Every structure is written in structure tokens, then in C-alpha cells.
Swiss-Prot record:
Pfam families: FabA. The keyword Lipid biosynthesis applies. InterPro entries: FabA_FabZ, FabZ, HotDog_dom_sf. Belongs to the thioester dehydratase family. FabZ subfamily. Its EC number is 4.2.1.59. Involved in unsaturated fatty acids biosynthesis. Catalyzes the dehydration of short chain beta-hydroxyacyl-ACPs and long chain saturated and unsaturated beta-hydroxyacyl-ACPs. GO terms for biological process: fatty acid biosynthetic process; lipid A biosynthetic process. Keywords: Cytoplasm, Lipid A biosynthesis, Lipid biosynthesis, Lipid metabolism, Lyase. The active site is at residue 54. This is 3-hydroxyacyl-[acyl-carrier-protein] dehydratase FabZ. One of its GO terms (cellular component) is cytoplasm. It is found in: Cytoplasm.
Length: 154
């Protein structure tokens, strides 16, 4: 694994197509291309736009956005693996299997996002992913992605 923080926001913007308010990864703490694994971080603040309606009296991060943050962290690793191809191809989130939500994520929490790929091919990939607050698992599941040519989306 590399020293932390390996990838900060400016470089993340080159690896992910997402932008505010939908960019849900703040930095990459470590990654290992040989092991196909990554650890990233999302600082959850009260200023997140989703807290306006989810839920004003007791704000918690929507579970689907925790899963999206995991998918984005995994997407960063795919971007690093694709390196020369990433300007031509896009990783699309295909599905989530065995998703479990175990703990609420609240303003002020630091969400640690971990993913390890069991498969990366020219067509896509599969990864096991886990989001934690401290040592407590908040959500986990198996993610699948398709790699498509950006031109095919026009």
C-alpha cells in the first residue's frame, strides 16, 4: 500500500466523472494495484445537500449514497488500472448484491471506504466493498461495473 493521503481532491477530479454535489469521495488513503484494492474517505458534513430532506430532525446519510460512495471509490481504482484508457471509457455501476446496512452515518462522521476487486476485465469488474465509521461497519456489499466507450453514450 502507498503512503497516505495518496490521492487528494484535484487528482480525484481527473479520475472520476462526478462533480459536486454528487462527488462522494474526498481523498484516497491507499491503494494497491496488484491486490486490486483501495481505501478512500468521505467526510460527512452537515452541509451535504441530502441532509435538507433526509431527515431534518435527525439527519442520516441515505444508504443508497453510502453505496454510491463505495462505487465511486472502486471507480477510482478502475481509473488507475485503466490509466491510458480512462479518457475513452467510463465505468458504469451495474449492480449491488448482498447489500447490508449496519449503522447510520451522521454529520461529522468520517466514512472509510474500502473495495477489493475479484475481477477486472475489458468488459467490467466485480468488487467487495465496505463502508466504516471508525471500526463499525456502516454498509457493505458486492459491486459490479460495466466498462463502456464514452462515445457510445452520446
Amino acid at each position: 500500500m502507498k503512503e497516505s493521503p495518496v490521492i487528494k481532491l484535484r487528482e480525484l477530479l481527473n479520475l472520476l466523472p462526478h462533480r459536486y454535489p454528487f462527488l462522494l469521495v474526498d481523498k484516497v488513503l491507499s491503494y494497491d494495484l496488484e491486490r486490486r484494492s483501495i481505501v478512500a474517505q468521505k467526510n460527512v458534513t452537515i452541509n451535504e445537500p441530502f441532509f435538507v430532506g433526509h431527515f431534518p430532525e435527525a439527519p442520516i446519510m441515505p444508504g443508497v449514497l453510502i453505496l454510491e460512495s463505495l462505487a465511486q471509490a472502486a471507480g477510482v481504482l478502475l481509473g488507475l488500472v485503466l490509466e491510458n484508457d480512462r479518457n475513452k471509457r467510463l465505468a458504469l455501476f451495474l449492480g449491488i448484491h448482498k447489500a447490508k446496512f449496519r449503522q447510520a452515518v451522521k454529520p461529522g462522521d468520517i466514512l472509510t471506504l474500502s473495495a477489493e476487486f475479484s475481477l477486472i476485465s475489458s468488459k467490467g469488474g466485480k468488487a467487495s466493498a465496505r463502508a466504516c465509521v471508525g471500526s463499525q461497519v456502516a454498509a457493505e456489499g458486492e459491486l459490479s461495473f460495466a466498462l463502456v466507450d464514452k462515445k457510445s453514450l452520446d
